[in-house]
Amino acid sequence: MRTLWIMAVLLVVVEGSLVQLGKMIFQETGKNPATSYGLYGCNCGPGGRRKPKDATDRCCFLHKCCYKKLTDCDPIKDSYSYSWVNKAIVCGGDDPHLKEMCECDKAMAICFRENLDTYDKKKKINLKLFCKKTSEQC
């Protein structure tokens, strides 16, 4: 059962370089990224963009929009470099496309931190059955 859970988390946590994104989320929020955000709301995890349930879910919606704009990089395969300086994420590296991906992940981690006060534990495991499509554009 534990192996199944670990595999599910690896598949569901948001797209991109999971190690780097997970570190950013933990650094900004102090929360375990997989268990706190992997299945949160209607937009965190796999699937298309849906009507956000709250501000935290909107962070995931905006992250998917940010990834949609990326060019010449694969958020699933590619990785980037960043550092944690004076409690701030600093995207690095010479590749502008990877830096752009890093900025998407940075924005999501900061968004999660800025919305910790509205984080709803009841929404952290949402199977997306009652999520509605949205006409909201990126």
Swiss-Prot record:
Annotated SMART domains: PA2c
GO BP term (any one): lipid catabolic process
Domain of life from the UniProt record: Eukaryota
GO cellular component terms, A-Z: extracellular region
Family annotation (Pfam families): Phospholip_A2_1 (PF00068)
PANTHER family: PHOSPHOLIPASE A2 FAMILY MEMBER, PHOSPHOLIPASE A2, MEMBRANE ASSOCIATED
Function: Snake venom phospholipase A2 homolog that lacks catalytic activity. It shows myotoxic and weak anticoagulant activities. A model of myotoxic mechanism has been proposed: an apo Lys49-PLA2 is activated by the entrance of a hydrophobic molecule (e.g. fatty acid) at the hydrophobic channel of the protein leading to a reorientation of a monomer.
Name of this protein: Basic phospholipase A2 homolog CTs-K49a
Organism annotation: Trimeresurus stejnegeri (Chinese green tree viper)
